[in-house]
C-alpha cells in the first residue's frame, strides 16, 4: 500500500484527480488491478468505490464511460433500470423518480410494495447471480466484486423487508 501524499488523496475525488488519464505504470495499483494483472478475470458490478456505477461523472453531469478504477476490470456492469443512469438509480425511488426529479427535496426513506427489482439493489443482485453462474463455468480464476447502494440515503427497500421488523421494537439512539 501507499500512504497519501497529498490531502486530495483522502477525498472522494482521488480517483478522478490521481488515477484517471494516467498510464498504467504511473498510478497506484488497486487490488482488482493486481488480480487482473496476475491472471484473474475481474468483474465489478454496482458501486465498488465512490462513483455509483464505476464511471467518473458527477450527479448532474452527463454519464461518461471513463473508468473510476482504470486497468482494474475486464468487465464493469451496472443495470440502471428505469432510472436511466447510475446517479439517478443511487437516489432512486420505486416509481422511477430520483433526487433530481424531486428538485433535491426528497424523503429520507421509502418502502414500496414492489419486488426486489423495484429498487436498484435488486437489479444489482440479479446481475451478480447471473454473472457468478457464468464465471463458475469457466476454467480460470476470477474476482467478482459486487457493491450495493444501501445503507445510504435515501433508505429504500421493498416493503417485505421493512415488515420483518416491528418499528416500536427498534430503539431510538440517544444521540441524534
Show where each model-derived region lies.
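Formylglycine-dependent sulfatase
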Residues: 1-176
Amino acid at each position: 500500500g501507499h500512504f497519501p501524499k497529498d490531502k486530495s488523496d483522502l477525498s472522494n475525488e482521488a480517483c478522478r484527480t490521481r488515477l484517471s488519464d494516467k498510464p498504467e505504470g504511473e498510478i497506484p495499483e488497486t487490488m482488482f488491478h493486481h488480480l487482473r494483472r496476475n491472471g484473474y478475470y475481474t468483474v465489478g458490478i454496482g458501486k465498488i468505490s465512490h462513483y455509483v456505477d464505476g464511471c467518473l461523472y458527477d450527479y448532474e453531469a452527463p454519464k461518461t464511460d471513463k473508468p473510476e478504477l482504470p486497468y482494474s476490470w475486464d468487465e464493469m456492469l451496472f443495470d440502471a433500470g428505469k432510472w436511466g443512469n447510475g446517479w439517478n438509480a443511487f437516489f432512486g425511488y420505486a416509481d422511477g423518480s430520483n433526487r433530481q426529479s424531486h428538485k433535491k427535496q426528497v424523503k429520507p426513506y421509502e418502502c414500496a410494495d414492489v419486488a426486489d427489482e423495484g429498487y436498484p439493489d435488486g437489479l444489482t443482485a440479479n446481475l451478480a447471480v447471473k454473472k457468478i453462474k457464468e464465471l463458475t463455468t469457466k476454467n480460470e480464476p476470477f474476482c467478482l466484486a459486487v457493491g450495493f447502494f444501501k445503507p445510504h440515503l435515501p433508505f429504500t427497500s421493498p416493503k417485505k423487508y421493512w415488515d420483518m421488523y416491528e418499528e416500536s421494537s427498534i430503539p431510538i439512539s440517544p444521540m441524534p
